[in-house]
Amino acid sequence: MDIFLQQMVNGLTIGSLYALVALGYTMVYGVMRLINFAHGDLVAFSAFIGLSVYAQIFGESVTSLIAVITVFIFTAAIVAVVGVLLERLAYRPLRTAPRLSAVVSALGAGLVIQNSVMLIWGPNMKIFPSNLFPATIWEIGGIVITFTQVMILGLSS
């Protein structure tokens, strides 16, 4: 039973991240009537931006809530600017064009973002420092809940 409950906690954590991405797709489609195929690329781009902001400001050695909030604010601002540029350059000129044109533009924007990430950060995987968040662990009846899981669930709800 402990394994089942542990996997429920793990599933809720991952599912809440998927729900945030799906919410982004839904919001864009609701406003623009366009499936933004570059949305996932922007999510990945924001992770690389966050990692770079953390390394530049804190040197990968600071573990505090202030550091996490600072990285989040800087990352959100940078990705918001990129999102506005994407909308102005790739989507707005095609508002009156056929839907297929906007879909092709979204696919192209995704490719540009992917290749820009590979050009800037390289093709190899990058890993966030494990000390970014406190290593606090709560054990409740055999179920292990980490600080990161609590933070993900709290921010996504």
Go through each PLM region and give its residues:
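Small-residue-rich transmembrane alpha-helical segments that form helix-helix packing/gating elements
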Residues: M1-L34, A38-S157
